[in-house]
Each structure stands twice: as structure tokens, then as C-alpha cells.
């Protein structure tokens, strides 16, 4: 044989076997194909660009923001009302500190931490808007769990993943690796510290996480500054004296100016605080940004709707489309977001919305089509029959399909099964779109309905398997690659959208909620809206009694 081939299967792909083959090849020899010259070429091309001052935007900071950005202090906690520009201030402070450190150090190490995976891109966007010179490569922007995982890998500490060690519960796994202060203290000599560390959304952090970051990853004389809003404490972290507990002593520096001071959203949020948070948190004492505030009509559109005993998905869709087309018709789809808190409802709504509106959406979770597509490698008779029918109709002259054509057929099947699932629930609403989809994919509508009926039992079993599968990797990947300016309407859980903002938000409340931290979750959903907020409540009488008077009061002002 001319080639030396090593084959690893699912059973034989272990760390030991991989390393054995890796070092058996040229990788372990001095004369490597991957030379220093090639390495340096890759490094040169992939190195992030230097950020010039002119690349950023000129941002006019208010007096308090300027104070926080320039204050000569090594440790600070910043507390800000919603819409006060906490993240904008954070990145400006980070760049200001970087420039000071740059005088004595060629490449200062700056760490910006989040909790929410999707916020990395948001913070990076904010960073490149700063009107200063800096090298982006010197800034690490990452969420806590990915950061700890990477650092443990650097320390050569192997993590025992729960599904590999069935005796270890998930909670024990997180405590052992992500909350274990002693683990990092023992291995501190293996850690390369950061010159400055900034944490956004600090209310999401456990106290042990704060201690690990500050005690083990901060350089001596390093800067440690944290930002947050305790009223968005959606994970139920401990509260003392109406405030979250952190590892910085003393009262926080406060950002009190809400940049939405003339909006109904601000008034609605303050009413929410008075009604639900007065005994738990300090209420926001906002400072008016604009002179004459209150003399003119409030900006924005707020609406509350309550429904009982109606089909949820079609009703939500009708309300959203009615508001988009007639109330906020001047808002781009790019600036509209639908928020909820249960994935099954949001997935079905996403599929229904795309099919009926014929518009694309952006989600932070798996779509119904992706779920079906990921399971289409199964060899089942009914699936083979459907594949063959679509292949014959779409490629009549091909005896064998190319890889690209096979993938296309799979996508057809995934879309057909998705729309068929909706058709079973809402036949009158979906029939026209379903028929058009069948025509586009060159399969008879009546034929496909007959096919679904004949194979109903097998398809139901297939759907059950699809719904039970784990899609965590897909969700993580979609969150990592989420960008706000994608040109499409977004659909997300409140948790995943935390930290982001949207011009118009449709917030869905279902009939059943978990009371623990739901007030904070709802408040977080409220504050994602910059100007327009529509609440759609399906049968949750407890929150109906709270929210309706609130909206009535604000809308009468």
C-alpha cells in the first residue's frame, strides 16, 4: 500500500489510541510538514486586527459614566438601573485601563466575563464601538463556564462528565469543577493571571465563582470591577439587605440615568418594581436625562392581552402579526423579538410563524426542522419509501443521487414532517401552505396525506424519539453564533436573551409558572424592550390581576 491509514471507530476512539496514532506520525518528529514558516503565516492571517480610534463611534457618556470610566480605583461594584448603559460603561472602562497598562506592558491581559453565552458577541460589538486605540487580541471575552473549562484544560485537569460517570449528579459535577475554590487555589501556580477583570451581569454569579475569579485569576495589583442589576436575579442567588451578595465591600457606585426616560417602558417597569419588588429589593431612583421630561407624550407602545380557552399558537401568531402590521409597522423585523420561557411552545411558534408569514426567523434553540433532520440517518422502511418518492420526482434522470442531492432530499423530508405536525393540530390554518410546500417539493398533497395516515404509528414513534433527543450542543452553537443584526425577527427564551435589547418585544406568559424567581424573570423580559412591549398572557390569572392594572395606569398617562 502507498498510504499508511489508521482507522478509529466509535468503540476504539479513545484518548490513548488517538495519542498513540498522533505520535506515530510525523507529528512527533522534528521535521514536520507544519513548519514554523507555515505556522507564522497562519498566525499572521488569523491575528485580529488592531482597533484604531477612528474605527469606533463617538459616544457621549454622562457625568456618572465618565466618573466610573476614569475613577482611579482597583476595585469597584457598579449597580445600574435598566437602560443605563452598564455594558457600554464596562467596555469603556476596560479600554481606558488597557491604555494605562499599555504604558508599562506590551500586551496587557484583559478579561471580560459574562454568564449568558450569547452576550459575548454583544460585548464584542460594544467594545469595537469604543473611540480609542487598542488591540482586540489582548481582550478575552467569554462566559464563565467556558472560561473555567478552558482553564482546567490548560491546567491539565481532566473533567469527569456526568454522562460518563453515572454516579455523579449534575449538581455535584458543577460544584466539583466550577465552584471549587480549593481546586484553583491548589493550582494557582499553573494559572496565567489577568491584569484587569470585568464581570457583566454579576447578579447571575455564585459567590464561589466570584472568589475563584478574583483570588485565582487576578494579577497582584490588578483591577477587578463588576456590573449588575439585582432585580434581574433570575437564578435566585442570595439576597442580603435588599441587595445581592458579592466579594466587594461597601455600597456600589450607581448609574441612575435611564436612557429610555421618556418611554412608557420606563414607567411600566417602575410600576412593576413598586408592585412586586418593594419588600425584596431597593426600588430604582432614576434621574431624568432630558429637561422637560413629562411635558410631552410618552414614547413607545405598550399593550397587555389576556386569553382563556383559545388555541395558543394561532392566537399568539395573530396578535403578533396584527401588531407588527398595524401598530409597529415602522419597525424592521430585525428589531422585533418574541420572548417566552418554555422551549416546546417557542419551537412550535417559530415553525408556525415561518410557515404562515413566509418570513425567516432567528432562534437561539433548535428548530423543528433541525430536530427531524438530525434523526434522518435512521434506516426505516417508511423513511426509505419517502426518500425514494422524493428522489424519483425531483431527480427522474438520476439512478444515483449525489451527496448534495441526498442532503436536499433530507431537508425536504424534515420540512414536510414539520409542517405535517402543525397540520395535524391546525388543519384549516395550515392546509394552503402545506399544499404549496408539497407542490414545491414535487410530491402530491393527497399522496403525502395518505402516506402519513398509512405510516402513522411508525411516524409517531419517530417523533417521540426526536422529541426525547438532546439538542444542547445545537443550542450552545446557536447561542455562540448569535448576532443581533441578522435582519430577521428573533425568538428566544428570556434566559437566553438576557442582556440584549430589542426595539419591540412580544412577551408570552403561559398559564403555569414556577413562582421562584418568576417575578425577576418577567421583569427581565420587560426590560428587554427599548420602546414597544406587548404582553400576551394565556390563562395565568395570578399575573393577570397584577399586570392589567399596571398597564391600564401607564397607558392612561
Where in the sequence are the language-model features?
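N-terminal accessory nucleic-acid engagement/regulatory domains that precede
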Residues: 1-44
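Short, surface-exposed amphipathic charged segments that create phosphate/polyanion-binding patches used
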Residues: 15-28, 75, 151-164, 267-273, ...
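N-terminal pre-P-loop "Q-motif" helix
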Residues: 33-44, 49-74, 81, 89
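Conserved helicase motor core of SF1/SF2 NTP-dependent helicases
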Residues: 58, 63, 76-109, 114-130, ...
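Conserved nucleotide-sensing/catalytic segment adjacent to the nucleotide-binding pocket
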Residues: 135
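Conserved RecA-like ASCE ATPase "motif II neighborhood" in helicase/translocase motors
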Residues: 152-216, 489-496
